[in-house]
Amino acid sequence: MLLLKISVYAVVIFFVGLFVFGFLSNDPARNPNRRDME
């Protein structure tokens, strides 16, 4: 049961980090070469 809980937390943290990374990467001021991804 502990392993399952750790796995769930790992997946949640992974998706949150992916969302934050994607949000920062889509910022035109930080990465203007990604305008075609919008």
UniProtKB/Swiss-Prot annotation:
GO CC terms in record: photosystem II reaction center; plasma membrane-derived thylakoid membrane
Regions that span the bilayer: 1-21
Keywords: Membrane, Photosynthesis, Photosystem II, Reaction center, Thylakoid, Transmembrane, Transmembrane helix
Location in the cell: Cellular thylakoid membrane
Database matches in Pfam families: PsbI
Location, primary (coarse class): membrane
Bilayer topology: Single-pass membrane protein
Alphabetical list of InterPro entries matching this protein: PSII_PsbI, PSII_PsbI_sf
GO biological process: photosynthesis
Subunit: PSII is composed of 1 copy each of membrane proteins PsbA, PsbB, PsbC, PsbD, PsbE, PsbF, PsbH, PsbI, PsbJ, PsbK, PsbL, PsbM, PsbT, PsbX, PsbY, PsbZ, Psb30/Ycf12, peripheral proteins PsbO, CyanoQ (PsbQ), PsbU, PsbV and a large number of cofactors. It forms dimeric complexes.
Protein role: One of the components of the core complex of photosystem II (PSII), required for its stability and/or assembly. PSII is a light-driven water:plastoquinone oxidoreductase that uses light energy to abstract electrons from H(2)O, generating O(2) and a proton gradient subsequently used for ATP formation. It consists of a core antenna complex that captures photons, and an electron transfer chain that converts photonic excitation into a charge separation.
Family membership: Belongs to the PsbI family.
NCBIfam families xref list: PRK02655.1
HAMAP family the UniProt entry points to: PSII_PsbI (MF_01316)
Protein's recorded name: Photosystem II reaction center protein I
